[in-house]
């Protein structure tokens, strides 16, 4: 059974394959020209997606067609090349062209997940008895499409990560002049106000002392997106130690979320061969 529906995997793979550098199937430096052939990228990518969705170790998802060592080497190669970040940016561009990003109202929030193996970005989690964990800072548009993500240790506060998170919006072009950022009470402070003022953004920040349900406003979309991201086992319990690998899976999951949002919105606006007839993708 595939890890993701075919209607979601195929467009992601075609976009990802276009970003891959060309490499010979057989090592040209081998004296006899009979070196073991390189495992096709599509086969490895399918195993990587399975690891992302299920959160399993590479030994558990390895098969006769692709070993766990091949998966590790290819993930390291793709992560160091920044292919997941490029894929996420490409999916955002397609979403903006077909549906349109709602950048007038942004929402940002942080989320803490487990990192039992530690790693370069892991830190002591204040909500998990000091065990190793990761924090994911995410900014979305008004409909919950993830625009940029920043990973850090679980012991990092949300407010200092807001600057790097918003800095990642530069590839989207200039924001609307009346753009606002919706934040929870963790961001209430002078540094956050100064940051938003420097960026020319208005801040809609929940105030301390007032009941939370009355101040949800337009911030709930980012919390829903965090829940979508936590549906990927590799993000919910990250076992990667390298910073590049952590960000690779983070942006790969974001690309899947953006593509799913695109298909669901485009289903009622466009027609194409194999168009899903229901909201449930197959």
Kindly label every feature range from the protein language model.
Residues 1-282:
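Short alpha-helical elements
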